[in-house]
Amino acid sequence: MSDMNDRDLARFAEELARFDRPSAPPALRAQLRASLLAAPVVVVSPPRRAPFALFTLPSLRLALAAVLILAVIAMAGGSAAASSLPGDPAFALTRAGDEIQALVAFDDATRLMTRVAQSDRRLADLETALAHRPSALAPATAEYIAATERVSAELATVLAQPRTAARDAAIARAAAASADHIAALQALAARLPADAQFGIQRAIEVQQTVHGKTETLPGRPASPAPSAAPGRPSNGPGRGSAPTALPGRP
Amino acid sequence: MDLARRAAGGDRRAFAALYDRHLDAVYRYAFYRLHTDAEAEDVTGEVFHRALVAMPKYEPRRPFLAFLYGIARHVVADHLREQRPSASFEDAIAHASDAPGPEETAARLDDARRLRAAIARLTPIQQDIVIFRFLEERSTKEVAQLTGKPESTIRGIQMRALAALRAALGSEGER
């Protein structure tokens, strides 16, 4: 290629750099962010034990039975359960699957991760209900609160244990998820009708309790949980009420 | 600890911060490699969802953007394989977006779409090099890392790619 051509091309390359750069549309930015934050968490499996070591576990029979039940549930209604929302008959299978997942967790830290992942899924259910099926909003809120309370109970167990890398990682994961959930719930609250505010404010309060517990991790910098929904009084309806008072809750 | 390490450890807020930082770069890559804005949006979403799943396997010594571009190149290639034959580029330009913006924005986007149509006439490796080297203004060394080709190869291809792009833009302008 001649010098003349090279100079022309260099000039052309400079012109290219001056082209206006398209950027992601705001709607994509917001929706994709919300969907990434609500996506189920990938939990890294704990290290594999030697095959014979399994037989020394006292809960082996229970775990095997649970796995069998899980397989039966998966075969019977896996796809229906996967696409079901709280309030659907098939959602009972989802809940049963969640309980078995927690039951077969190797230790409390893994169980906490599992419970956090389940609460992520319940938050996604809540967002799906708001977007596509408002009639499922109340049961979805109740299921979300129940899932968060299970995280809270498991977190209390893990916090009481001596520090290990796995324990601290699980608590850090719960703390991160909790902060994201509070932000997501506050965004949801802004879009909800007045009669659904009771449940969502209660959900925010429960999640703030979880976040408060994670602040007790030694060495963790104090970071206040996001406050209650902007523009709403902190002692709004639902504070201190039992979650059983929620509409749609069994 | 940096954001990518924290994200690899499961910190979703760290991943969200990385998303905020790199979304536009990934979107632009998809925008220039694909035919329509809608496809670019779909692929951008797919890239970040795949990145989220792959985070536990992320190697922190590698730049995070290179990790994202690696996923983006695969997703774009998969998408193009699945979509073939697709709508013509004339259609893509004519129906690029259903949402008209202010005049100035629309004019700027029209330029970007004309450039996209011209880039589509290049070979896939030329497209990558034009996007990374001249539109994203990455160094030859970075482009070599992103594409897995030696720097000398990049330097050779980039001149041919520029010449081809200039010709393609010329013929786009005559339409």
Residue spans for each PLM region:
Chain B
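Short amphipathic alpha-helical boundary/capping segments
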Residues: 2-6, 114-122
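Short, charged helix-capping/linker segments at alpha-helix termini
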Residues: 6-17, 27-46, 146, 151, ...
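Residues within the DNA-recognition helix of helix-turn-helix
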Residues: 22, 157-162
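Arg/Lys-rich amphipathic alpha helix in sigma70-family domain 2
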Residues: 32, 53-60, 70-90, 108, ...
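Structural recognition of an alpha-helix C-terminal capping motif at a helix-to-coil junction
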Residues: 42-49, 62-74, 156
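Internal acidic/polar
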Residues: 78, 86-108, 112, 139
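Short, Lys/Arg-enriched C-terminal cap helix and immediately downstream tail that follows
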Residues: 81, 122, 127, 162-175
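A short pre-motif secondary-structure segment
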Residues: 129-133
